[in-house]
From Swiss-Prot:
Zn(2+) binds at H69, C103, H120. The lineage of its organism: Bacteria, Pseudomonadati, Pseudomonadota, Gammaproteobacteria, Pseudomonadales. This is Purine nucleoside phosphorylase PA4543. Signal peptide: none annotated. InterPro entries: Cu_polyphenol_OxRdtase, Cu_polyphenol_OxRdtase_sf, Cytotoxic_necrot_fac-like_cat. Purine nucleoside enzyme that catalyzes the phosphorolysis of adenosine and inosine nucleosides, yielding D-ribose 1-phosphate and the respective free bases, adenine and hypoxanthine. Also catalyzes the phosphorolysis of S-methyl-5'-thioadenosine into adenine and S-methyl-5-thio-alpha-D-ribose 1-phosphate. Also has adenosine deaminase activity. The keyword Protein transport does not apply. Its EC number is 2.4.2.1, 3.5.4.4, 2.4.2.28. It comes from Pseudomonas aeruginosa (strain ATCC 15692 / DSM 22644 / CIP 104116 / JCM 14847 / LMG 12228 / 1C / PRS 101 / PAO1).
Amino acid sequence: MNAWLTPDWPAPARVRACVTTRSGGVSQAPFDSLNLGAHVDDDPRAVEENRRRLTERLECRPSWLDQVHGVTVVEADPSRVLRADASWSAMPGVACTIMTADCLPALFCDRSGTRVAAAHAGWRGLAAGVLEATVDSLGVPGDELLVWLGPAIGPRAFEVGGEVRDAFVAAHAEARSAFVPSANPGRFMADIYRLARIRLGAHGVTAVHGGGFCTFSDTARFYSYRRSSRTGRFASLVWLQD
């Protein structure tokens, strides 16, 4: 569990954040070992134990979501699983929690350390505006926010069709710079981190940190759905400390 990641961003001291990896759990292959996804056909008892270990180590209460590649943002509630793709909280000890295995996890906080949020951004949610919706849910100006982009599929592995490129370019012409033609006709290699920065910048958020990971190629640390459709999920969490 020492292999878990701590985001490198200038967040206030009371803002805590963490990204789990594959290490430190009890799940068997192909979910080995710290799978936190209850929807991927893993042994439910293993997932329960993995989540218990997570909660015990971090001393917070994760708020799990039923993620559907949409733009709904909810207030984090550890007592139930809400259908949404982002959550926010102003309550100490409540962790906004996102599960991914190639999609982009984005963590948010305000500069005063009073609110946090987490968003799940696959290409559909990203194009539909889940990051912008998360910014709006926090109720503070964009220049008062900090964002950290967590582990997602990298630009050398994320091949998409022309319809994906068109969806982003239609909203922001600058998005053309996030797509490079692939070796396959009509296909493009997409930079999801650049796309996120473009969307956030257009919404007034410029203090964006992180990026540079690739879940597809980093087999030791991260699950990747594109690499193997039968796989686990790791979590990205952000919360306020008392």
